[in-house]
């Protein structure tokens, strides 16, 4: 089994759903490196009795800290249970995190069923590395 670096994030009204999902998959998740934003990380530690690398709370920059880890290839999977029914004060940060995950072709799940698909994929236990997009032309563009 290849150890994955998994970022787990949930908006306040979605934390209970994420924790229930984590309980369902705790035997698998406890063998991986887990990262999370503030209070989500605390809840995960309490649930799994494992150490979670905690960022700041989302509104205090935790989403952006995870985004930086994605850019630096320090995260393999993002599981983000975001609340589709409530506006967030840090919505630009949420969009930035999701955008940067797509930019770097990172596997992302935004609900339990998609997260189930990720964890049960045959690629999950392999040494799979998503193809990194080639942004050289963008980096070298003349403005």
From Swiss-Prot:
List the GO cellular component terms. cytosol
Question: Which of UniProt's keywords are assigned here?
Answer: Lyase
Cite a single GO MF annotation: methylglyoxal synthase activity
Q: Is the keyword Ribonucleoprotein assigned to this protein?
A: no
Q: Give the enzyme's EC designation.
A: 4.2.3.3
In this protein, the active site sits at 63
Tell me the superkingdom of the source: Bacteria
Write down the chemical reaction(s) this protein catalyses.
Answer: dihydroxyacetone phosphate = methylglyoxal + phosphate
Q: Which InterPro entries is this protein grouped with?
A: Methylgl_synth, Methylglyoxal_synth_AS, MGS-like_dom, MGS-like_dom_sf
MGS-like domain ranges (all copies): 1-143
Q: What class of enzyme is it?
A: lyase
Q: GO terms for biological process?
A: methylglyoxal biosynthetic process
The UniProt record gives the binding positions of substrate as 11, 15, 37-40, 57-58, 90
Q: What is its biological role?
A: Catalyzes the formation of methylglyoxal from dihydroxyacetone phosphate.
Family classification = Belongs to the methylglyoxal synthase family.
Q: What is this protein's record name?
A: Methylglyoxal synthase
Q: What taxonomic ancestry is recorded?
A: Bacteria, Pseudomonadati, Pseudomonadota, Gammaproteobacteria, Legionellales
